[in-house]
Amino acid sequence: MDARELAKYIDHTNLKAFATREDIKRLCEEAKEYGFYAVCVNPYRVKDAAEFLKGTDIKIASVVGFPLGATFTETKVQEAIMAVRNGADEIDMVMNIGAMKDGDYGFVERDIREVVEAVHPMGAKVKVIIETCYLSDEEKIKACELAKKAGADFVKTSTGFGTAGAKVEDVKLMRSVVGNDMGVKAAGGIHNAKQAIAMIEAGATRIGASRSVEIIETLELI
């Protein structure tokens, strides 16, 4: 795999609370320079990213219910709609983790489905962050099944704000559950090309990283 091929797996990410307009401009310039698939930014910064990426084919992802997933479904829906209206192509929503731990699977599925049904007609894709660090393997399996049943396009390992990030074994498990019908995004703690390629070999079709430039620049060290 060469640098351009690897870059096309990557959502170049800045979800810091203190990210400035200048930080987002830099993120977008790096995305253009390295050929990353997308940038991932907080909803407030989607308009900025859309401005900086105008005329390119680089996608814009934004987050919903981030990073806890514990807000109202209606809030997630409106947040997603507004992000797409402002230029987002993809929505990375956080599953309601507490409801998942409660075993309230009907609610978890509805929470996802309502976001999916709101933005799919607008042409946007939905990734569901299941936050693997808080789940047992059985819960990870169930979460993936619910995301698939709800019509989501991807399952995603982590917010990057939890107690741990992506693990190869979790990516393998998630891929085994969703099959080839959905994407799997590995995110959190991926800092170099070796880690990124391990995730891809495990079944990830997208990598979320804030240190994407390091990932590309360490490719030659493998």
UniProtKB/Swiss-Prot annotation:
Per UniProt, the enzyme's principal EC class comes to lyase
Q: Where is the active site?
A: D92 (proton donor/acceptor), K156 (schiff-base intermediate with acetaldehyde), K185 (proton donor/acceptor)
Which UniProt keywords are given for this protein, alphabetically ordered? Cytoplasm, Lyase, Schiff base
* Protein's UniProt keywords contain Nucleotide-binding: no
Can the keyword Transmembrane helix be found in this entry's annotation? no
Q: Which GO terms describe its cellular component?
A: cytoplasm
Disulfide pairs? none
Q: Give any Pfam family that matches.
A: DeoC
Its UniProt pathway annotation is:
Carbohydrate degradation; 2-deoxy-D-ribose 1-phosphate degradation; D-glyceraldehyde 3-phosphate and acetaldehyde from 2-deoxy-alpha-D-ribose 1-phosphate: step 2/2
The pH response of activity is noted as: Optimum pH is 7.0. Extremely stable over a wide range of pH levels.
- Regulation of catalytic or functional activity: Shows high stability to high concentrations of acetaldehyde.
Family of the protein in this entry: Belongs to the DeoC/FbaB aldolase family. DeoC type 1 subfamily.
The record's section on PANTHER family has: DEOXYRIBOSE-PHOSPHATE ALDOLASE (PTHR10889:SF1)
| Subunit and partners | Homodimer.
Q: What is the protein named?
A: Deoxyribose-phosphate aldolase
| Organism expressing this protein natively | Aciduliprofundum boonei (strain DSM 19572 / T469)
